[in-house]
Swiss-Prot record:
Residues 1-17 form a transit peptide. One of its GO terms (biological process) is mitochondrial translational elongation. Belongs to the EF-Ts family. It is found in: Mitochondrion. Pfam families: EF_TS. The gene is TSF1. InterPro entries: EF-Ts_dimer_sf, Transl_elong_EFTs/EF1B, Transl_elong_EFTs/EF1B_dimer, UBA-like_sf. This is Elongation factor Ts, mitochondrial. It comes from Coprinopsis cinerea (strain Okayama-7 / 130 / ATCC MYA-4618 / FGSC 9003) (Inky cap fungus). The keyword Mitochondrion applies.
Amino acid sequence: MLRTLRPTLPSRCLRLYSTAPEKPSLKLVAELRKRTEVSIVKAREALSASNNDIEAALQWLAKDLETTGAKKAAKVGGRTTNEGLVSVSILSNFTASGLQRGIRAAMIELNCETDFVGRNELFGRLAGDIAHTAAVVAEPGASVFQNLSLEFLQEAPLVSRSDPTSAPSGTVATTIRDTIAKVGENITLRRALVVAAEPPAADAAQALRLGQYVHGTIHQPTEGRIGTLALLGLKYPSPKGFTQETTEKLASLERALARQIVGFPTQSIKGSEETALYSQPFMMLPGELNSRPVGEALQAWSVQQGIVGSEGDAGAVEVLEFAKWSVGEPLES
């Protein structure tokens, strides 16, 4: 009886085959990185773990970031943070008679360990979003300028400055934690200030306006090393309020005052010393009033705009209050 003979293969030549997951395409990796700003390695890992499904990969990354972020935050939590940014956000900068409009603004200081991270676009976006969130939650209180509780702010849902209508993806605190995981440095929210005023009564004789200026900006004109907010009080020149031309000149005056506060060692509004705003030469105001003491220049400007009849009429345009912050400066006790 004949038998079919087959060669016997050595056991070492036997192989088992299985279907390996498809390698994530460069297009999917790029799309995921664009939406999350994770590294290429992390994007590939997320897609591989999610069978190349973008939405599933986003969920995977969110869970991974929560875990790694908490570990990283705990690891770097004791490190000193002396660098960073001051960020300003203004939702509404004036009150006006007859308009149901109040002032809403905020200024925050966000710190990190190095100037390198302080200049990072991701860090700058975080600072801007936190300032915007602070302005959104601002409510009028006993004074127009108020310190905002950091605990309250960190528990608030983070509102995107660039897309404020989008649903928040987390709180201020969780977003700081996630950013720590991405940049590898400790990040701390040092202080927050809100400016809030209700719309004035219909027969109000004074308007409020808020000026701002940030020095040492990097990615946005509202984020830098030094920031200031300055509140102005103005008498109405007539029951109809200000003309369009005067309003435009007011905007220039506000910016000049804010720049003056930042550019000089300004510590108070009135007084005889050089740290008093009204005694300083108004170097930041262009035109014929340049170099006159700020207090005198404001009175002369009011006459030029027809707000008052003579420079002897006090209180036509006043700086009522200001806040000036520098990154890393000592805080008042």
